[in-house]
C-alpha cells in the first residue's frame, strides 16, 4: 500500500520555505500531491495556471529525485475533502514558529474529527527559511526589492516580470 500525502497551500508564490517542506515530505510518502487552494474571495497575484506551472517546475524534480510520484491539483472545497479525494492518509503542513503551531493544531484537530484516517504531519522549517512568507515576498517584490534569497530563481524572475512597470 502506498503512502499518499497532500501538501495544500496557496503557493502565491512558491517560496524556498515551501521547497524546504517538499524536500522533507518526499521522504515520508510514495506519492505527494500538492494542492493549490482556490478561494473565490481572494485575489491572488499569480493566476491558477501560473501557480500550477510554478509548483510543477519547482517541486516535481525534487520528488522525482527522491523516487516519489508527484501530482499537482487545485481545490475549492475543504482541504480535508481534497485529501480524501486523492486518497491521502497524510496531510503535510510546514511550521515556522509557535504561532503556526497553535493555528495548525486547531485545524489538524478539526480535520482529524472529520476524517479520522487522515493524519497531519508537521514539518518544522529549516533555520534558513523560517522568516520567509509568501506575503512578505510579494510585498518586497512589489516595492522593487530583491527576493532571490527567498524564492527559487524561476519564481524570482516571474515576480520581477509581474511587477515590471
UniProtKB/Swiss-Prot annotation:
It comes from Rhodopseudomonas palustris (strain BisB5). The record marks 18 as: Transition state stabilizer. It is an enzyme of class 2 (transferase). One of its GO terms (molecular function) is ATP binding. This is Phosphopantetheine adenylyltransferase. PANTHER family: PHOSPHOPANTETHEINE ADENYLYLTRANSFERASE. It is found in: Cytoplasm. The keyword Nucleotidyltransferase applies. GO terms for biological process: coenzyme A biosynthetic process. The keyword Lipid metabolism does not apply.
Amino acid at each position: 500500500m502506498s503512502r499518499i500525502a497532500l501538501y495544500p497551500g496557496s503557493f502565491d508564490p512558491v517560496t524556498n520555505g515551501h521547497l524546504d517542506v517538499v524536500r522533507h515530505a518526499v521522504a515520508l510518502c510514495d506519492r505527494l500531491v500538492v494542492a493549490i487552494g482556490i478561494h473565490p474571495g481572494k485575489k491572488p497575484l499569480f493566476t491558477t495556471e501560473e501557480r500550477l506551472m510554478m509548483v510543477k517546475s519547482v517541486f516535481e524534480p525534487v520528488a522525482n529525485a527522491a523516487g516519489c510520484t508527484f501530482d499537482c491539483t487545485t481545490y475549492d472545497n475543504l482541504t480535508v475533502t481534497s485529501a480524501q479525494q486523492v486518497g491521502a492518509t497524510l496531510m503535510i503542513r510546514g511550521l515556522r514558529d509557535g504561532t503556526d503551531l497553535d493555528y495548525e493544531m486547531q485545524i489538524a484537530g478539526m480535520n482529524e474529527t472529520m476524517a479520522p484516517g487522515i493524519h497531519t504531519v508537521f514539518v518544522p522549517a529549516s533555520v534558513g527559511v523560517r522568516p520567509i512568507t509568501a506575503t512578505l515576498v510579494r510585498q518586497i517584490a512589489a516595492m522593487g526589492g530583491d527576493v532571490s534569497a527567498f524564492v527559487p530563481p524561476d519564481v524570482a524572475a516571474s515576480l520581477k516580470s509581474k511587477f515590471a512597470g
